[in-house]
């Protein structure tokens, strides 16, 4: 882990039921039934985005509203979803057992022919399970924004100076993909798609053991 991206076709079949349209509808239902619905005392943290920019619209509170946003080529992200679903919480706990550290689960809803975010990188290790539809992932090693220059507001336009080789992977339902921390990536939805993204910030000793 930590050296290069790695795709595993067909190895995420157990994750298919963790995020589908029914799960999305149930999670969004927390807006209606209040804090008690999720057992966490808070509503889902939902973002709406398009091509790397947040869109200032009310967050969807039903599957119907999600469909309406998708018809406008807008993507939806549910952050820290492990706080609102027992099975997603168990998934996060499983990752934390294997790779001790801070783990969060994000859920992505992306319409066909769109990119929710532009070229960017994450400070955490990213593991992706595709649960519905098809996505193309484009990945490059980050040689222009070294880790020792971390910033709260990273300059993603630096990708224009990147000269590392371009890698790609097409994910269909049931596939896994690992993207190392701080590697550039761009995601394009070929079909309407649902995916689970597990972000892990490992403790330093764990990185040394597994690196």
Predicted features along the sequence, with ranges:
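Active-site region of the double-stranded beta-helix
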Residues: 13-175, 183-211
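Conserved beta-strand-loop-short alpha-helix elements that form
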Residues: 178
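Fe(II)/2-oxoglutarate
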Residues: 1-7, 13, 159
């Amino acid at each position: 882990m930590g050296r290069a991206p790695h795709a595993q076709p067909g190895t995420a079949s157990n994750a298919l039921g963790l995020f589908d349209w029914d799960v999305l509808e149930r999670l969004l239902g927390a807006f209606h039934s209040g804090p008690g619905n999720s057992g966490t005392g808070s509503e889902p943290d939902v973002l709406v985005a398009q091509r790397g920019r947040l869109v200032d619209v009310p967050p969807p509170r039903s599957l119907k509203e999600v469909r309406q946003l998708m018809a406008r080529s807008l993507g939806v992200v549910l952050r820290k979803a492990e706080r609102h679903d027992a099975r997603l919480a168990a998934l996060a706990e499983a990752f934390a057992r294997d790779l001790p550290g801070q783990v969060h689960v994000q859920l992505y809803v992306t319409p066909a022919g769109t990119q929710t975010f532009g070229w960017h990188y994450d400070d955490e290790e990213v593991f992706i399970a595709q649960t519905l539809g098809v996505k193309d992932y484009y990945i490059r090693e980050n040689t222009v924004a070294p880790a020792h220059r971390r910033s709260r507001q990273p300059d993603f336009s630096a990708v224009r100076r990147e000269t590392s080789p371009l890698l790609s992977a097409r994910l269909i339902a049931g596939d896994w993909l690992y993207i190392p921390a701080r590697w550039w990536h761009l995601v394009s939805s070929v079909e309407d798609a649902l995916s689970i993204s597990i972000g892990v910030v490992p403790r330093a000793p764990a990185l040394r053991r597994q690196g």
